[in-house]
Regions:
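N-terminal pre-catalytic "stem/leader" segment of glycosyltransferase-like enzymes
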Residues: 7-39
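Short hydrophobic beta-strand that contains or immediately precedes a catalytic carboxylate
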Residues: 9, 77-79
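PAPS-dependent sulfotransferase catalytic domain
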Residues: 40-77, 84-145
Length: 145
């Protein structure tokens, strides 16, 4: 018997989250789950999914936002040892599978160079803080109150 609370899976990249996502997809039908991978209007997407009585499971690459923390949902994530996660992240971006990866990897010659990028440092902490970049954090007036 499934728990009646919604399940929110915060999929931090390079932490074996794809395995958990596949497990969720095999246990919840398409109508019961909502995947969110775009950050455009993220809080509104999350709010809509949390309020939809048919949605039982929400997952994607998004940070722990206040709308989630304030809900009654069960929140889960996976963490990975930080050095292994950074190396995996570097290897993934080294494949340069799209323009974003090409841009990011300009001038990056080694995993050590990659760790100097703000985007790769403390990524797991950033996901759980609710802010994926410093600019977003500094622009949030409520944080400083």
């Amino acid at each position: 018997m499934r728990h009646s609370k919604k399940l929110v899976f915060i999929h931090i990249p390079k932490t074996a989250g794809t395995s958990l996502r596949l497990l969720l997809e095999s246990n919840y039908n398409e109508a019961e789950r909502r995947s969110i991978y775009s950050h455009k209007d993220l809080d509104q997407q999350l709010k809509s999914a949390l309020e939809d009585p048919g949605v039982k499971c929400i997952y994607g690459h998004f940070p722990l936002r206040p709308v989630i923390a304030e809900s009654n949902a069960t929140v889960v994530t996976l963490f990975r040892e930080p050095i292994a996660r950074s190396i995996s992240h570097y290897n993934h971006y080294s494949k340069r599978i799209n323009e974003k990866h090409n841009e990011l990897m300009k001038g990056i010659e080694s995993p050590e160079d990659f760790t100097r990028l703000v985007q790769s440092n403390y990524r797991q902490t950033a996901f759980m803080s609710g802010y994926l970049n410093q600019k977003e954090f500094l622009e949030d007036k409520e944080v400083l109150q």
